[in-house]
């Protein structure tokens, strides 16, 4: 996965996100922007940056305040919006073990032409006391209803540490706080394995699916150059949202299956575990969730674990999350040409069909897993889908 550092120079007036995770190394935050956002202005000390989407009337303002200036994120956000003469409704939410502030707002001072803007804002304490990160995501009020999903998606894509790459975002956490454990039973390899998810998980994940599909649909409907980056981002954000939700399930599966996997393949029990889970997914009930073009046809990961229907992308995404939680390097491959998805697992000693994924260290070859054809083992893929250039990787750090 590519990860760029923003260099805030006065002479640099445009920077294109293009589906990349944009990072400020100085303040230790990242944002997985929707496609098309560009920097239009910034301060040399990196404390302030303004973004505009080149396709949409969507804007973002980032301001990092010194830690000593405010006593809380709520105070930082209220001061930020007061400077902009904004009217706002505030709420607080604990995210990444920090009390954060969120607001919906309207302001007459954000847009160059003086028209009223509407949007969402958040303030988050940064690690190592590097300050309070205030982010405003907004549009002209006249088009807010059309762009609300994009604006919220941006705020929900803020990352402040390694752990936030693998748990629901701030907005989703605030809208769908944890409720209570929900017992589930997973039948795999002849075992009935008890586990738990949260009772809110399926509903919360569906919120993310619907929102991010709405964002992706804009790029697809207009056949924009960033369409495929937007598609990858769609799945990446679903994976990010799901990782923490299935963490206990991953642990329980690993605990119950490890001994048997070590007996099957003492030299490579990780490969044996991946194979067991692949066979398990091949027995799921096959069904696309929706046949409507304006709705995502992928079932949420928690709903699949509760017995819901699934197809290639939902299964591949599920296995990717489970295996990554078991510290097994994995990814998901998607193809527009083949209308299909595959699991990818990094198992250097395992023989079979692989797809190469580039990175800054020369790349890795991920062995593929076909989740919808019963009996196929790791390393086997449909004979009519072997052209590697037609596959794109969906990864998490």
Residue ranges of each PLM-predicted region?
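Sec-dependent signal peptide recognition
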Residues: 2-11
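N-terminal signal peptide c-region/cleavage motif recognized by signal peptidases
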Residues: 14-16
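N-terminal "mature-domain start" segment
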Residues: 20-45
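Surface-exposed amphipathic alpha-helical segments
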Residues: 37-38, 135-174
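Conserved polar/disulfide-associated segments of primarily extracytoplasmic proteins
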Residues: 40-135, 139-141
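Secretory-pathway-linked proteins and extracytosolic
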Residues: 186-248
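Secondary-structure boundary elements
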Residues: 234-307, 355
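Hydrophobic/aromatic-rich core segments of domains that either
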Residues: 267, 302, 314-397
């Amino acid at each position: 996965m590519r990860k760029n550092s923003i260099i805030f120079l006065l002479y640099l007036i445009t920077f294109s996100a293009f589906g990349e995770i944009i990072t400020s190394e100085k303040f230790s935050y990242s944002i997985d922007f929707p496609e098309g956002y560009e920097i239009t202005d910034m301060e040399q000390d990196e404390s302030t940056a303004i973004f505009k989407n080149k396709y949409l009337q969507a804007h973002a303002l980032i301001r990092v305040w010194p830690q000593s200036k405010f006593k809380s994120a709520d105070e930082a956000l209220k001061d930020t919006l007061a400077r902009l003469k904004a009217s706002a409704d505030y709420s607080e939410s604990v995210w990444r073990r920090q009390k954060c502030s969120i607001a919906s707002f309207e302001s007459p001072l954000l847009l160059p032409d003086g028209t009223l803007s509407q949007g969402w804002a958040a303030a988050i304490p940064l690690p190592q006391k590097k300050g309070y990160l205030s982010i405003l995501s907004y549009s002209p009020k006249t088009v807010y209803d059309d762009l609300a999903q994009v604006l919220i998606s941006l705020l929900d894509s803020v990352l402040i540490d390694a752990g936030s790459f693998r748990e629901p975002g701030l907005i989703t956490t605030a809208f769908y706080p944890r409720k209570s454990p929900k017992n589930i039973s997973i039948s795999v390899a002849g075992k009935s394995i008890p586990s738990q998810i949260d009772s809110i998980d399926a509903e919360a994940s569906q919120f993310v699916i619907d929102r991010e599909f709405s964002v992706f649909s804009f790029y697809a409907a207009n056949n924009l150059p960033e369409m495929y980056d937007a598609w990858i981002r769609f799945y990446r954000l679903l994976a990010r949202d799901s990782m923490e939700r299935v963490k206990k399930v991953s642990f329980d599966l690993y605990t119950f299956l490890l001994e048997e996997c070590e007996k099957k393949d003492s030299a490579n029990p990780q490969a044996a575990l991946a194979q067991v889970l692949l066979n398990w997914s091949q027995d799921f009930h096959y069904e696309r969730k929706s046949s409507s073009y304006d709705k995502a046809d992928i079932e949420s990961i928690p709903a699949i674990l509760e017995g819901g229907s699934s197809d290639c992308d939902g299964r591949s995404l599920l296995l990717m999350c489970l295996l990554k939680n078991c510290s097994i390097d994995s990814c998901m491959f998607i193809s527009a040409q083949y209308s299909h998805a595959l699991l990818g697992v990094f198992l250097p000693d395992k023989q079979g069909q692989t797809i190469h994924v580039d990175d800054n260290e020369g790349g890795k070859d991920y062995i593929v897993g076909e989740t919808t054809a019963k009996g196929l083992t790791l390393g086997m893929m449909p004979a009519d889908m072997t052209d590697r250039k037609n596959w794109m990787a969906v990864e998490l750090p």
